[in-house]
């Protein structure tokens, strides 16, 4: 199959939301420019990469950029990150570069309606013409939260961290801004001019916003926006993983689901929640605080949720308790739907797992597992349905998931 995989591999400075002794450092307060590359070469069968860091952001585009859309992390709610007729990654050249932005970028750029949109940790949102790089609009959504106001963390300040999402049907950009004095606002912006359509608080009920971090990419399904939360770098305070959803027009009551753990269990993978063709929502859960190996605490797991956020099913590896003790959790990378009703997931331990989406299998109930990454998997993965390009710490690694679910 001809095509290009786009995999976001987060550097060690960007993946510390679930606390690792070997992962540290936050970005500087000054922001990077945006660079956009294009090519006139034909499509290639090799895998391409797109990396976002505090130093640089690059988006690969086709020769007709006005027609390109990349609506969220991995392009769509299934996070596949696969472009069937994309450019040759080996023949890219820089087309334009923006002026310096006002803060660090942790989320992927999104592309829709001839615009490239990015959001910074200073709560600024910028839109550029995708063909020329000319600024289209810029809006600031409020003062961000300084590191000094938080018990722990490694982003200073914290504003917009998770990748936004676009509803192409209404040309609306959705993102979450962390604003003073300590509140997460879901903001809906007009893609054409940056005007605010509406904004509402989406802090998980009963949890302290100053201990929750909105790092995961936003998701749209079932006419709702889904927002996931984990903890700060250092795992301080009484945080728990959570999901909150709101209707696309901001109306009605929010729906929510909180990981049923005593503490922790963050949903911190930058790739965010994944949605399958059934409409079910899949989440990967990081370490939870358990002291009893015989009492599963819903940490180091993949959960299947209905669109109304009712929990249906869960899976965890047989060594879930050991993974928690070694801070080698699954939360570092999100679930990835494959063809045939399967789910691929990996984590800090570098092991890849294939699950049955319709029956996750409980503890140790995966269809297959294999060592995939040296140094762990972080960020996100991409797939054409069977070949999976995993965002490993040392660089993208491609594996094949066979008809028997085995990984090779």
Q: Locations of the language-model features?
A:
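Bacterial N-terminal signal peptides that target proteins for export
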Residues: 1-8
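Secretory-pathway extracellular proteins and peptide precursors enriched for disulfide-bonded cysteines
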Residues: 9-11, 144-145
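Residue-level signal for mature regions of secreted extracellular proteins and peptides
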Residues: 11-12, 63
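C-terminal motif of bacterial Sec signal peptides marking the signal peptidase cleavage site
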Residues: 14-17
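Noncatalytic, solvent-exposed loop/strand surfaces
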Residues: 19-23, 31, 42, 55, ...
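Juxtamembrane proline-rich low-complexity "stalk" or linker regions positioned immediately after a signal peptide
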Residues: 27-53
């Amino acid at each position: 199959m001809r095509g290009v995989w786009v995999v976001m591999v987060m550097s060690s400075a960007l993946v510390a939301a679930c606390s690792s002794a070997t992962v540290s450092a936050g970005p500087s307060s000054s922001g990077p420019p945006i660079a956009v590359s294009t090519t006139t070469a034909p499509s290639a069968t090799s895998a391409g990469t797109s990396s976002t860091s505090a130093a640089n952001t690059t988006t690969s585009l086709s020769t007709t950029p006005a027609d390109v859309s990349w609506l969220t992390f991995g392009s769509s709610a299934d996070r596949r990150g696969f472009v069937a007729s994309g450019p040759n990654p080996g023949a890219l050249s820089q087309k334009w570069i923006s002026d310096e932005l006002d803060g660090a970028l942790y989320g992927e750029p999104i592309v829709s309606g001839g615009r490239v949109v990015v959001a910074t940790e200073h709560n600024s949102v910028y839109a550029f013409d995708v063909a020329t790089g000319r600024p289209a609009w810029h809006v600031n959504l409020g003062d961000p939260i300084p590191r000094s106001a938080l018990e722990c963390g490694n982003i200073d300040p914290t504003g917009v961290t998770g990748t936004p999402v676009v509803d192409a049907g209404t040309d609306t950009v959705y993102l979450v801004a962390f604003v003073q004095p300590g509140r997460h606002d879901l903001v809906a912006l007009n893609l054409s001019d940056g005007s605010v359509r509406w904004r509402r608080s989406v802090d998980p009920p009963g949890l302290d916003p100053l201990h929750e971090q909105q790092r995961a990419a936003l998701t749209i399904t079932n006419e709702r926006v889904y927002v996931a939360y984990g903890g700060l770098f250092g795992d301080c305070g009484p945080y728990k993983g959570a999901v909150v959803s709101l209707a696309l027009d901001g109306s009605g009551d929010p729906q929510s689901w909180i990981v049923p753990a005593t503490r922790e269990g963050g949903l911190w993978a930058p790739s965010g929640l994944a949605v399958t063709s059934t409409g079910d929502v899949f989440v990967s859960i990081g370490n939870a605080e358990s002291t009893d190996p015989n009492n599963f605490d819903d940490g180091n797991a993949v959960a299947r949720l209905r669109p109304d956020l009712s929990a249906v099913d869960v899976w965890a590896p047989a060594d879930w308790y050991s993974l928690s003790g070694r801070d080698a959790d699954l939360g570092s990378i999100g679930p990835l739907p494959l063809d045939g009703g399967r789910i691929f997931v990996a984590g800090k331990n570098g092991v890849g797992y294939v699950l049955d989406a319709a029956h996750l299998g409980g503890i140790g109930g995966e269809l297959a597992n294999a060592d995939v990454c040296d140094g762990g998997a972080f960020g996100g993965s991409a797939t054409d349905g069977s070949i999976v390009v995993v965002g490993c710490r040392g660089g993208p690694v491609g594996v094949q998931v066979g008809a028997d679910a085995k990984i090779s």
